[in-house]
Amino acid sequence: GAGRADDLAERDAHCAPRLDPASLALLSDAARRTWHFFEVCVPASGVGLPPDNLQLDPAAGLAMRTSPTNIGFYLIACAAARQLGFIRDDEMLKRMRGCMDTLERLEKWRGQLYTGYDLNTLAPLRPRYVSAVDSGNLVGALLLCAQYVSAADAELSERLMQLAAGMELRALYDAERDLFHIGMDVEGGRMSASHYDLYASEARLLSYVAIMLGQAPVKHWQRLSRPALRTDGAWTLASWSGTMFEYLMPDIWMPAPENTLATEMQRGALDAQQRWARRLGRPWGVSESGYYAFDIHLNYQYRAFGLREAALCSDVSAAVVAPYASVLALRLAPDAAARNMARMQELGWLG
């Protein structure tokens, strides 16, 4: 309840790292710039939902499509902007209500959003597909924001909770294997043959919220594979692509306690990234991201970049460093992450 949330907030405030003024200024500026994307681009969509991206060079403008994960992060960004003092309660609530007004009328499958929607028509993108990890991300965001706004707007909080409760995550659960399918091909009427079966995965949040909501059994958590490996002397758990995203993204919702498998796994993965970067003399933070390749419309392409020594997949490359990976590492290693971001700024990477 609220008392437990207050206890956690007080503990986190007490344990918050003390960064130097320059690092704090850098992080504050990065946060404000990040919020500015949502501040400007969501109203431009006209439907209260975040466009997928804004591409300035080559000029392509707003990508007028969105996804459940994009929407979830926008809702969290509204709460974070309020927490950081960028906006007041009234703007946060107005934005969340506008988002919910659209979300509640989107076409869904078993209460879950499809992987993509056209923001001009609000129609699902074809072929219609439901992603388990997308659904987990959105449920996590809805639950977080429902608690955050409960005192300011009980009705909005209830709407957020009801949307989360209506998402039938169990429909994607394989009871025979006790694992989640990657997703559902709605056009073809079939579940994916593949499953999310690794603990070191962005799908860890999906597993957690599904168990919490009673939509997956507790034994599912033990079914997630935890293959250990060594990378330059540090140990971690293997992920599929060796990306920072897989190890750290769930921390946004469920920060791992100290002296647990999750934290040791994350520290090992971060150590491997830092060793790799030192050898090459560059910033660390290899993760999935956009990169310098284009389709026929000159849109940047997107793929997973990761460390081969931490990956089970053989087709991975560490060719691209993603600045957002440093932000994901702030809780785990605040000083190192801030220094890494400062170095990126010195190299002219600030957009």
Describe the residue ranges of each PLM region:
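Ser/Thr/Asn(+Pro)-rich, low-complexity disordered segments
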Residues: 1-8, 13-351
